[in-house]
Amino acid sequence: MDAEIEVFLVDNGSLAPGATLELRALAKGLSERLGREVEAVSLLHSHKVNPAELGGMEATIVKRRMRASFAAGRRRFMILPLFLGPSRAITEYLPVLLEELREECPEMEVVIADCLFGQSVDRPEARLVEMLMDHVRAADPEGAMHIARRGR
């Protein structure tokens, strides 16, 4: 991945401080795995949370964060949606927002990765299915074993 590309882990956003703190923890873990910075950014709402509730660090939203990047001369972005599937936030709001930002910065380049579910409802992401099965097994080992035997 090109070092010039800014990578944003993007959720819908929330007024609950915990949501932003959890997004930051995921972004930090991903940064460590990738060996490059991944920044926690929300589509909406989180910028309204009092920074004192966020360890003194203000939350940001895509529009503000990309504008700050434009001002710093950056033009290339990757958005990693932290969404199970392509909600309206991803299929409707984000494209409109990006077109608005493109008017401000025509040379902007944006890559949007798939949502967690994958590219098609007909072929869900197998790793997500396995992760959910792990949760079932952890919550009820005996019941999960019965389910796993029946389902295979």
Each predicted region: which residue ranges?
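Extended amphipathic ligand-handling, pore-lining, and cofactor/metal-binding catalytic surfaces
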Residues: M1-R152
